[in-house]
């Protein structure tokens, strides 16, 4: 997920996972002229001039074509599909942040389930505030802990499986209440962990005391999900769904199934980049959900029946939607092109705001080429499987920065950026960030408030205290260097 940042720019560690969302994004200023009763009108934050992003005056640099044109051997595959598949399999076996659902067996042990929950659902040590700015009282936190129903976890239980039926939030606690670190600053919900997309297989490990929430384990994350967002099915059907062929892979930022009043459960369903959906077993010979099927791909989507059980229902995915019949080749052209499909999207901590954060952004870009990454920045940068260059002193960092290639992932505390090339002798990156700053003409720190997917110079970025991002770089991951 994100990657949990503490209340400012620091990194908060949760058991095996380092959460630390990203820190940047695009803010287009709204000019609002306030009427004045007497004298000059006061200028609010919304009416102040937006700083120019250093190195981005040339409009061409905001296009994928510019960077693709500068990329060496833009169409040369950087890894074969077989090599990528082998690395994905290794990641599932050897990376402790990943969960091999098929290997969990027919029974779950109570200690294992309790460990999963307690790794995520920890009582906050710092103050938390609700949307109105009121501090959460101890009794409110007590209720959240009680809702976990840890006392009801059996010593052993039959392993249950399900498929996610719609884009769904993963939560720290079984609640949809939004909580924040600072009164009035409601952009980052500290109870938001991540999100799962339709068709994601999960193991259903536990239920909240009121039954409205399920604790689920997916391949890349474990947390609480609304019960209504999961359809329970048998292990064979659930685990086979994502491996079925032929299929369509979403290669756009997001696509939607065709609107259909005849089948509301599969109408206008959002499918984000990297989502894989199998084609319908028996393509429709007549109308499909009230529409001729020739103009779309007939796919099968998971839905819940009245009892919450899994049913696979046909849906139409328009041929105009940005999808493919398999992963795109892992090339510099596609790395840049796929990343730019998110340009300008608002930053969303833990996939909030129907968007994504820094680690989610790079994960979805690589997923469109068939390559799996761990969910959080800490797990990505610390993976025992990926090609990771852990940076040390300044000399080593400078050497590494000079050797950056398209697709490399650069990590600083709480954030990850993807290299898209060089200009003016400097590396440039595309990233999904919440804040971000740079030096002004007088040497002072200028806060950019990027708050979305943007392109910036790597060396030009500074933290609030003026320290350059590159001086705090901790690791470089080259996902295309498959092992």
Question: What feature does the model see in each segment?
Answer:
Residues 185-208, 265-289:
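Conserved beta-strand/loop element in small beta-rich adapter and peptidoglycan-binding domains
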Residues 42-61, 220, 228-249, 254-258, ...:
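Aromatic- and glycine-rich peptidoglycan recognition patches
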Residues 22-32:
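Bacterial N-terminal signal peptides
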Residues 195, 373-440:
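...with weaker cross-activation on analogous glycine-rich loops/strands in unrelated enzymes
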Residues 335, 339, 349-369, 373-377:
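Active-site nucleophilic cysteine motif
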Residues 166-170, 174-187, 248-262, 387-395:
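Short, structured beta-strand/loop micro-motifs enriched in basic residues and often containing a Trp
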Residues 41-168, 217-249, 285-287, 291-336:
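Boundary regions of SH3-family modules and the immediately adjacent low-complexity/disordered segments
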Residues 186-189, 264, 321-326, 344-353:
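Second-shell loop/turn segments in exported
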């Amino acid at each position: 997920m994100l990657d949990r940042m503490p209340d400012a720019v620091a990194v908060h560690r949760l058991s095996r996972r380092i959460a630390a969302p990203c820190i940047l994004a695009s803010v287009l200023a709204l000019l609002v002229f306030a009427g004045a009763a007497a004298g000059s009108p006061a200028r609010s934050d919304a009416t102040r001039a937006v700083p120019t992003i250093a190195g981005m005056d040339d409009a061409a640099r905001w296009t994928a074509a510019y960077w693709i044109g500068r990329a060496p051997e833009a169409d040369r595959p950087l890894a074969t599909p077989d090599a990528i598949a082998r690395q994905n399999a290794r990641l599932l076996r050897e990376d402790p942040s990943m969960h091999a659902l098929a290997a969990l067996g027919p029974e779950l042990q109570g200690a294992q389930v309790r460990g999963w929950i307690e790794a995520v659902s920890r009582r906050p040590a710092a103050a938390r505030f609700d949307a109105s700015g009121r501090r959460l009282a101890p009794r409110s936190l007590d209720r959240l802990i009680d809702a976990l129903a840890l006392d009801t976890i059996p010593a052993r239980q039959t392993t249950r499986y399900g498929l996610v039926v719609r884009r769904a939030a993963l939560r720290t606690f079984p609640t949809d209440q939004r909580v924040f670190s600072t009164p009035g600053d409601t952009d980052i919900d500290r109870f938001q962990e991540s999100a799962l997309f339709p068709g994601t297989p999960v193991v259903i490990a536990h239920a909240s005391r009121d039954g409205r929430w399920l604790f689920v384990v997916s391949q890349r994350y474990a947390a609480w999900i609304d019960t209504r967002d999961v359809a329970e099915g048998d292990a064979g059907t659930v685990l086979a769904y994502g491996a079925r062929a032929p299929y369509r892979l979403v290669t756009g930022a997001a696509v939607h199934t065709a609107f259909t009043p005849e089948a509301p459960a599969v109408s206008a369903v959002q499918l984000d980049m990297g989502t894989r959906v199998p084609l319908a077993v028996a393509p429709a010979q007549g109308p499909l959900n009230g529409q001729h099927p020739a103009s779309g791909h007939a796919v099968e989507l998971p839905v819940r029946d009245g009892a919450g059980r899994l049913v696979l229902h046909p849906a139409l995915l328009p041929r105009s939607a940005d999808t493919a019949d398999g992963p795109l080749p892992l090339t510099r052209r596609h790395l840049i092109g796929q990343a730019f499909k998110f340009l300008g999207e608002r930053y969303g901590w833990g996939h909030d705001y129907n968007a994504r954060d820094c680690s989610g952004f790079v994960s979805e870009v690589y997923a469109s080429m068939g390559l799996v990454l761990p969910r959080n920045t800490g797990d990505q940068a610390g993976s025992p499987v990926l090609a990771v260059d852990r940076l040390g002193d300044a000399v080593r960092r400078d050497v590494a920065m000079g050797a950056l290639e398209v697709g490399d992932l650069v990590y600083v505390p709480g954030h990850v950026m993807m290299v898209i090339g060089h200009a003016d002798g400097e590396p440039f990156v595309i990233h999904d960030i919440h804040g971000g700053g740079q030096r002004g003409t007088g040497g002072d720190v200028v806060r950019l408030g990027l708050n979305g997917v943007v392109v910036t110079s790597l060396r030009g970025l500074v933290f609030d205290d003026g320290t350059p991002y590159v001086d705090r770089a901790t690791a470089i991951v080259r996902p295309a260097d498959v092992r």
